[in-house]
Amino acid sequence: MRREYARSLRGSRVTGTRPFRSWKTVSLIGAIRLGEKPKIMTSRSAVDGRKFLRFVKQRLAPWIYPGDIVIMDNLSIHKMTMVREAVLDAGAIPLYLPTYSPELNPIERLWADMKRRLRTLALNAEPELLRAVRRLRAATPIAKIAAWFRHSLAEAHIK
């Protein structure tokens, strides 16, 4: 991932490097909760319903406490019957956010933060990118996650 834009002093040009070969897709699936580090799963292709269901069963379900609320946006794979059943079987309550409301979803702030930091690193190779994602996940401050939840709740009260 590379930065798309740059700044320079007035009258001077910005120069930089960027690979021009084709790139590979790396998708992230994740979950956050108060007081704990994020759970993230990587995929070397687009995420479909089967991969998301695997994430829910393997990573999310063991992490859920009875009565937890699992907040999801309106992506079609989130609304699959098998996903909903897996969340309910784990003892949680699925909550779907209104359409076009990423400001209410605290994990969107994690993705924005990770993308910004990954662009700053300007990594070229896929293994480097995957290692960086793991490092960034581990380095995510728990206090920052709490702030993301507070901000999303404040947005919900405004609406």
Place the predicted regions along the sequence by residue.
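Extended, low-complexity cationic-aromatic segments
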Residues: 1-58, 153-156
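Short aromatic-enriched loop/helix-cap "lid" or pocket-rim segments at secondary-structure transitions
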Residues: 1-5, 83, 107-109
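Short, hinge-like loop/turn segments at secondary-structure boundaries
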Residues: 6-10, 88-89, 113-115
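RNase H-like polynucleotidyl transferase catalytic core
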Residues: 12-20, 89-106
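RNase H-like two-metal-ion nuclease catalytic core shared by retroviral integrases
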Residues: 25, 73-74, 95-119
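RNase H-like DDE/DDD metal-dependent nuclease/strand-transfer catalytic core used by mobile genetic elements
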Residues: 53-95
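C-terminal anion-handling pockets and recognition modules
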Residues: 107-159
